[in-house]
Amino acid sequence: MQPDLLSRKTAALTLQKFHTLSPLTHCMTNDVVQTFTANTLLALGASPAMVIETEEASQFAAVASALLINVGTLTQARAHAMRAAVVHAKRVKTPWTLDPVAVGSLDYRRHFCTELLSLNPDAIRGNASEIMALAGVSNSGRGVDSTDVVANALPAAVMLAQETGAVVVVTGEVDYVTDGRRTVGVGGGDPLMTKVVGTGCALSAVVAACCALPGDRLLNVASACSWMKQAGERAIVRSQGPGTFVPYFLDALWQMTQEVEA
């Protein structure tokens, strides 16, 4: 039995709330996607901050609305800073999100992400291979690319949510979002989104920001997935390929926020 799909009306109402609150989102993310991630958050009305130095990162967790940990370009120094930020975020009750990039194919980051799971993230976002590897079900995956079908990863996502208390997002042609008890699907988007570096990482930042919103975290996080897929659908109408897709995608996010505020 397939999960119910999130309604776009729910996503629009959540976007109103998001734009009003403008979450200050601390992004400890990878070097490849920082600009695109920041621009995605700005287009939706959030406030991004890229603070990575250990002493500053732990301090900033006290003032941020939400924290993102993305291990895409992980180093020992960065792992130390991320660990310190998460510990402090937990202390001051700042919600944090884990993006376990390529966790299935590299031992160092898999061990690090497993360690972070003990600090109970509020959300986890990954592709099918990453979620299955993080749950200990499989070590497949080709770097950042998924080699598994999204539906096959759903049981692992449910198990991971039950074990950690996180809302877990498995992204693909249909995104599945689960808190271990309830699961919703988010359809839409366009295959070209997989040909642009950073769309998944940017989604993780939006998921992190949505964890700062009041109300139902499952629906808030699922709404983040919906906004990104809707923007992809709008962008593909005007773009001619990956190079023109990105500016149209950011424009679409911005236009969506203007529409819900009208």
UniProtKB/Swiss-Prot annotation:
Binding-site residues for substrate, renumbered to this chain: M50, G198
Named cofactor requirement(s): Mg(2+)
GO molecular function: ATP binding; hydroxyethylthiazole kinase activity; magnesium ion binding
One Pfam family, short name: HK
Annotated residues for binding of ATP: R125, T171
Pathway: Cofactor biosynthesis; thiamine diphosphate biosynthesis; 4-methyl-5-(2-phosphoethyl)-thiazole from 5-(2-hydroxyethyl)-4-methylthiazole: step 1/1
Reactions the enzyme catalyzes: 5-(2-hydroxyethyl)-4-methylthiazole + ATP = 4-methyl-5-(2-phosphooxyethyl)-thiazole + ADP + H(+)
EC number: 2.7.1.50
Alphabetical list of CDD domains matching this protein: THZ_kinase
Protein family: Belongs to the Thz kinase family.
Entry function: Catalyzes the phosphorylation of the hydroxyl group of 4-methyl-5-beta-hydroxyethylthiazole (THZ).
Name the UniProt record assigns to this protein: Hydroxyethylthiazole kinase
Organism in which the protein naturally occurs: Escherichia fergusonii (strain ATCC 35469 / DSM 13698 / CCUG 18766 / IAM 14443 / JCM 21226 / LMG 7866 / NBRC 102419 / NCTC 12128 / CDC 0568-73)
Encoding gene per record: thiM
